[in-house]
Amino acid sequence: MQSFVQQLKALSSAEDFLQFFGIPFDQKVVNVSRLHILKRFFQYIRQQDVLPEGDEAALFASYHALLLKAYGDFVISTPAQEKVFKVFQDTAGRQHVSLDSLRASLPARTVA
């Protein structure tokens, strides 16, 4: 039988994690926020001062609660509001590009 950590390593998608931990989910929420949910989940894990060691059932319960919390964040909010990724953190999700910088980025035109 695989250890808890080995089983976690085999998971890859948000759906895999949610199913593994027995968390019911709305596919529409996951379709929009899958990467955000997983990143938030791992942020929550890193924020824990102490996680149960040597007790796989307690570790499973802790991870279950953290994933449920991460998923819940995106049920009641949007990725843009949660700002998990840097692109949403910088300048409130807005980026100003001047017309001059766009012109400068275009290749020079040659007259035929």
Swiss-Prot record:
Coiled coil: none
Disulfide links within the chain: none
Pfam families: NifW (PF03206)
GO biological process: nitrogen fixation
Record-linked InterPro entries: NifW
Transmembrane spans: none
Record's keyword terms, sorted: Nitrogen fixation
Family: Belongs to the NifW family.
Subunit structure: Homotrimer; associates with NifD.
HAMAP family assigned to the protein according to its UniProt record, in alphabetical order: NifW
Function statement: May protect the nitrogenase Fe-Mo protein from oxidative damage.
Protein name per its UniProtKB record: Nitrogenase-stabilizing/protective protein NifW
Gene transcribed to yield this protein: nifW
